[in-house]
Swiss-Prot record:
One of its GO terms (molecular function) is microtubule binding. Residues 453-467 have a biased composition (Polar residues). ATP binds at G79, Q80, T81, N82, S83, G84, K85, T86. This is Kinesin-like protein KIN-7O. GO terms for cellular component: microtubule.
Length: 1273
């Protein structure tokens, strides 16, 4: 178990930031002096002045060397954006980074290791917006992650290049780096927008030697070295990311957050506790899963900035690094072992053990061999002893039979002297037949010499055997080690031929040695493995011990039975021996007497009696012998069964050994076959390599020969007669190629003319758009004039209303003056006149209100039409942009066609000159297009100025709809023109395909004449290289133009944004002015209220005058006072309730009618009393009525003015909202246009790359064809 190595590297600071930095570094710890809790310790901390080599040598160098030995390794840089991660990993030409240093160090260690052969593969991928892209094969995008038992976690479809030098690796890396996503932010000009993983797969095995092919091991070590450059975490507030950059930053932060959670879980030991670690939440953590708590050596380089602005980001980076310190990995060597490799490895280990035994333990091995030989000898002796015992038993049985035969002969001799009956003879014959059996322990004495000696020998031997066996059999069975050292028992030292002597002279061997007996049939022990021999000895020893236990138990049982029988026979034998001795003495006496006197009848009787006794004894003896024979037979059968089992076991062992030998031989044969196959494959590869080298040398020779042939052809042009047909064919080919060239030139001229026509059409369309813009500007000016006219008319109307208001006020004053002079009879007429005047004023007010409403509606309509006109102008702009894009597409297609024509015309110098002319024309076209673009930009500025002018207008736009319809028709025409352009483009693409087919035909014809035009083909290759460089230059120029076009669009969008901001500011100012107007209107309302109060004071004064005038009639004065008081209250109420003007108007009219009715009543009452007084009071009454009417008109006017101002404010607010909506739409459209431009740029770049790849393939095909042609020559 080894933990992750974590080092910290600080980015260099400016002098100002270094003074204000809150972080302090001391040795391998970093802390904030003001915060005691913010202190971190790491394996290494590198200050601002350190070099990348120091960072590499801290831990990465060891990881690289371990990767060569078969350990997985991972190194990745972590930190916020603009902290120096890419500089640490990639470096620069002056100061190389970790990846170049690791690559060079890797190849250096491989070159130093001469005992192994290596195969290196590299891959380079990026994780962009959670999509895996192959940087070595840009067409491979959105790859998937898979997992299996053999490969583990891997990316399916990822391209892996076999590399053989560090220069090749770095070149491939540069190629992949050119396809990496890099963007610009406020914090970094070249900010990495994706995570990249540079992976080296290292395979190695031991070198195959000619002498020791069988000794080599096929175990393959496979290790993976990952060098990861992570994208930095960022904050949108600091980087200013928007749109695509914001999306990229969110994906980067999400993946880094998942990495942080995985590190946190592993540092807390969640995985060891059976918890869940979210490796699958991000593709980055899924790919790096083996490096995070798995089978790998891992190092983290944490890049930080000590500036005070980025204190929070530095703190989070250091917390991540401190958590990573607690994560442990378990790295081990990754080897792929086959069965053959395992067998070879075991053989190698066995051979190493043997060599060790021979070298270091030679004495000990000799002793072990001697012990093994002794055990084998002992086992063979034991075996021979068993065989001798069997043979001796056979000899003993044969000897017993021989003794019985001799006894039978003696009995026959005796029976010849005595006449016996047939019954006795039969008995004797039966006795002789039965007496042939083995006589083991008890043999009767039939004669003095032979039988007594035999019996004494047998008894002495039996007693010695019994004594020896009793000592060994009374106790338990002894182990083999004691049996070997058991004392010997000499049963009969004098008898050298006896069986027991041979048995006792043999030493009991070690039973484990029975299997390993060195006999002629068995192979020598030196040819076997000592480990295998020991295992077989242990197994056979166990089997032999089991068989020996079984044999001993059976033998003990049989011997116990024999002992019992011997006891019985001993008891019977004493009496039988005595009787035998007596019978023998008597027989001898009788024999001697029989010689003397043969005719003595008493002697005959005695002989008969003795004969009967002998027969009885013989019967008993035969029965006992039968029992003994049965027991012996059972014991022998058991011994035979045991021996058969032992033989079967030995046969099984022998068969198992043979099977093992056969299996070993098969394994050896298979190993040899596998080795032969591998050797054949390797030899085939070597042969292929040598053949390739030979072919290359032959190709060079053919090149040299072609050059010599060309020189010879140049010299042989003098022999025109011999080479005339070749020259004729060559001239025909040149003519055909010139004709094809002319056709190509014509097609190019047609394409060029079509492009010129398209350019002219675009210029015409541009002129039309300019005319439309001029017309729109004139319309806008007319609308401005009309708006000014409407404003003047509105001013006139307002002045007219004010004059009418003043007239009405004067009229009311006149009426108030006339009230005092009116009589009671004329009050009714005046009342009617007042009503009529009031109604007229009402109608006039209604007319003015309707006019104002109509004007406001017209204004809203004009603003809506204005907004629609602006939208249509935007559409025109977008269509113009689309036309410009089409022009750029046509330019790109023209460039592609130029490239194809360049490839086709590279064979002849004349075509090159024409192509240069075409390039000049194309350059002129590009200049014209650039001028057109500048003009379009100028027109855009003019249009933007016109839009700014239009934003401030609030006048009517009546005729704009018709003109917009006309512009729509024109737009439809433009769309039709665009479709025509598309069809032309399709036709041009078909022409291009035809050109490509023609090129293919030309190539085929060139292949046929390659034998005769080798020099020209070589020149063509050189020219192709030149034109490929030109193509690259053209593509770079196109890319620069596209970038410039993008920058121009961005500048225009920024201008539009600034203008829209200005419009917003103007709208805000208008809102402020409207608020000021509202305040002014409120102040006017207050002033009106104050004037109404003044008028109420005047009414009070007039009431006092009426009181003085009505002194004559108290009733009339009281009525007038009450009426005046009511009018005062009503006026004050009307001033307070200014918001509810209509209700107050109704209330005032009703009150006025009541007053008029009261005035009529008063006039009737006063007509009878005093007309003169009424006439005097008429003037103040009229003044009052006039003042009331004037107040009513003022109230109506104030209400109308307030309503108008409210309506104006509402309309202005609506206009502002519409403008804001239009601005937001413009912003969205600009964003969409920028995204479309980016997509199209990506598609165009992808197409260019595909075409470049196809051209490269064509070049390779041409080279192959050249090589094939050279081989055929």
């Amino acid at each position: 178990m080894e933990r992750i190595h974590v080092s910290v590297r600080a980015r260099p600071l400016s002098s100002e930031d270094a003074k204000t930095s809150p972080w302090k570094i001391s040795s391998d710890s970093i802390f904030m002096p003001n915060h005691s809790s913010l202190a971190f310790e790491f394996d290494r901390i590198f200050r601002e002045d350190c070099k990348t080599v120091q960072v590499y040598e801290a831990r990465t160098k060891e990881i690289v060397s371990a990767a060569v030995r078969g350990f997985n390794g991972t190194v990745f840089a972590y930190g916020q954006t603009n902290s120096g991660k890419t500089h640490t990993m990639r470096g620069s030409p002056i100061e190389p980074g970790v990846i170049p240093l690791a690559v060079h160090d890797l190849f250096d260690t491989i070159y130093q290791d001469a005992s192994r052969e290596f195969l290196l593969r590299m891959s380079y991928l990026e994780i962009y917006n959670e999509d895996i892209n192959d940087l070595l094969a840009p067409e491979h995008r959105k790859l998937q992650i898979h997992e299996n038992l053999e490969k583990g976690i891997f990316v399916a479809g990822l391209r892996e290049e076999i590399v053989a030098s560090p220069q090749q690796v770095l070149e491939m890396m540069e190629f992949g780096e050119s396809h990496r996503h890099i963007g610009e932010t406020n914090m970094n000009l070249y900010s990495s927008r994706s995570h990249t993983i540079f992976r080296m797969i290292i395979e190695s095995r031991q070198k195959m030697q000619d002498e020791g092919v069988g000794n080599s091991c096929d175990a393959v070590r496979v290790s993976v070295l990952n060098l990861v450059d992570l994208a930095g975490s960022e904050r949108a507030a600091k980087t200013g990311a928007e749109g695509v950059r914001l999306k990229e930053g969110s994906h980067i932060n999400k993946s880094l957050m998942t990495l942080g959670t995985v590190i946190k879980k592993l540092s807390e030991g969640v995985e060891t506790q059976g918890g869940h670690v979210p490796y699958r939440d991000s593709k980055l953590t899924r790919i790096l899963q083996p490096a995070l708590g798995g089978n790998a050596n891992t190092a983290i380089i944490c890049n930080i900035t000590l500036a005070p602005i980025h204190a929070d980001e530095t703190k989070s980076s250091l917390q991540f690094a401190s958590r990573a310190l607690r994560v442990t990995n378990c790295a081990h060597v990754n080897e792929i072992l086959t069965d053959a490799a395992l067998l070879k490895r075991q053989k190698k280990e066995i051979e190493e053990l043997r060599s060790k035994l021979k070298t270091s333990h030679s004495d000990h091995s000799e002793e072990e061999i001697l012990n093994l030989r002794n055990t084998l000898l002992k086992s063979e002796l034991e075996r021979e002893r068993i065989a001798l015992e069997l043979e001796e038993e056979k000899k003993a049985q044969a000897q017993r039979e021989r003794v019985l035969q001799e006894q039978a002969k003696k009995i026959k001799n005796l029976s010849s002297m005595v006449l016996l009956s047939n019954r006795d003879e039969k008995r004797e014959q039966d006795h002789f037949k039965k007496g042939k059996r083995r006589d083991t322990w008890c043999i009767g004495k039939l004669s003095r010499d032979s039988t007594s000696e035999d019996q004494s020998n047998v008894l002495s031997r039996g007693s010695s055997l019994e004594s020896a066996r009793s000592e060994r059999e009374t106790g338990p069975l002894l182990p083999f080690s004691e049996l070997v050292n058991e004392p010997l028992y000499n049963i009969n030292e004098e008898d050298e031929d006896s069986i027991e002597g041979t048995l006792e002279d043999s030493v009991l061997p070690d039973p484990c040695a029975l299997v390993n007996v060195t006999s002629r049939k068995k192979p020598s022990i030196k040819q076997k493995n000592p480990v295998v021999v020991e295992n077989e000895l242990d197994r056979i020893q166990r089997e032999y011990e089991a068989l020996l236990l079984q044999y001993e138990t059976e033998r003990i049982i049989s011997e116990i039975q024999i002992e019992c029988l011997k006891v019985k026979l001993g008891e019977d034998g004493l009496s039988g021996d005595a009787k035998c001795k007596q019978s023998e003495v008597v027989g001898n006496v009788h024999c001697e007497e029989h010689v003397v006197n043969l005719r003595d009848p008493e002697a005959i009787l005695l002989i008969k009696q003795l004969q009967e006794k002998i027969n009885m004894l013989e019967l008993e003896k035969s029965s006992s012998n039968r029992n003994l024979d049965d027991l012996v037979m059972v014991a022998t059968e058991q011994n035979i069964c045991a021996r058969e089992k032992f033989a079967e076991i030995q046969e099984e062992i022998h068969a198992a050994r043979e099977e093992a030998q056969v299996a070993r031989e098969q394994l050896v044969s298979k190993e040899s076959e596998v080795i032969d196959v591998i050797n054949e494959n390797f030899n085939s590869l070597v042969n292929v390599a040598t053949e390739i080298e030979v072919l290359e040398s032959e190709f060079q020779k053919y090149k040299a020969s072609v050059e010599t042939i060309s020189s010879v052809m140049n010299e042989g042009l003098q022999d025109f007669a011999f080479f005339s047909p070749l020259i004729h064919d060559f001239t025909l080919f040149v003519r055909q190629s010139s004709e094809q060239h002319d056709s190509l030139i014509n097609s190019y001229q047609t394409v060029q003319s079509s492009l010129k026509k398209k350019v002219l059409d675009v210029e015409n369309e541009k002129l039309l758009l300019q005319e439309q813009c001029a017309g729109l500007q004139s319309q806008i000016e007319e609308l401005n004039q009309e708006a000014q006219k409407h404003e003047t008319s509105l001013k006139m109307l307002s002045e007219h209303h004010e004059s009418e208001r003043s007239d009405l006020l004067s009229h009311i004053e006149c009426l108030e003056k006339d009230i005092g002079s009116l009589s009671s009879s004329s009050l009714a007429k005046e009342k009617e006149n007042l009503r009529k005047d009031f109604e007229k004023t009402k109608t006039k007010l209604k007319d003015t209100e309707s006019k104002l409403k109509n004007s406001m509606q017209d204004k809203t309509k004009l603003e809506a039409e204005k907004a629609s006109a602006e939208r249509e102008l935007k559409r025109l702009h977008s269509q113009k942009a689309l036309l410009e894009r089409d022009i750029s597409k046509q330019e790109s297609f023209a460039g592609k066609r130029r490239d194809s024509l360049l490839v086709e015309r590279s064979a002849n110098q004349s075509l090159q000159e024409e192509f240069k002319q075409l390039e000049v024309l194309a350059f002129e076209m590009e200049t014209t297009i650039a001028s057109l673009e500048e003009e379009l930009a100028a027109e855009r500025g003019e249009k933007e100025e016109a839009l700014c002018r239009n934003d401030g207008l609030g006048s009517e736009i009546t005729d704009l709809t018709e003109k917009l319809e006309h512009s729509n028709t024109k737009l439809e025409h433009l769309q039709n023109d665009v479709t025509e352009l598309k069809t032309r483009l399709e036709v041009s693409s078909s022409d291009q395909q035809q050109l490509e087919t023609n090129v293919k035909q030309l190539l085929e014809e060139k292949e046929e004449l390659a034998m005769h035009l080798a020099n020209s083909l070589l020149e063509m290759e050189e020219e192709k290289a030149i034109w490929s460089s030109k193509e690259k230059a053209l593509t770079e120029a196109v890319e620069e133009k596209i970038r410039l076009y993008k920058n121009i669009q961005i500048e225009s969008l920024s201008k539009e944004m600034s203008e829209e901001k200005k419009e917003l500011e103007s709208c805000r100012l208008e809102c402020v002015t409207l608020a000021d107007r509202l305040r002014c209107s409120e102040e006017n309302a207050k002033q009106d209220k104050e004037s109404s109060l003044e008028k109420s004071l005047e009414i009070d004064r007039l009431g006092d005058e009426l009181r003085s005038a009505d002194a004559v009639s108290k009733q009339s004065q009281e009525v007038l006072k009450s009426d005046i008081d009511i009018l005062k209250s009503e006026v004050q109420h009307a001033c307070k309730m200014s918001d509810t003007f209509q209700r107050e108007m109704d209330y005032v009219t009703s009150e006025r009618q009541g007053l008029l009715a009261r005035i009529e009543e008063l006039s009737k009452e006063l007509a009878s009393s005093n007309r003169w007084q009424i006439e005097n009071a008429k003037n103040p009454i009229q003044d009052l009525t006039l003042k009331i009417s004037s107040q009513e008109t003022n109230l109506h006017k104030d209400a109308a003015a307030e309503n108008k101002e409210k309506a104006k404010l509402k309309m202005r607010l609506r206009g502002m909202q519409a403008r804001l909506d239009a601005i937001s739409l413009r912003y969205k459209q600009s964003v969409q246009e920028s995204e479309l431009m980016n997509r199209k740029f990506k598609e165009a770049s992808a197409k260019l790359k595909e075409k470049l790849a196809s051209k490269a393939l064509e070049v390779l095909d041409l080279k192959k064809q050249l090589s094939a042609s050279s081989r055929t020559m």
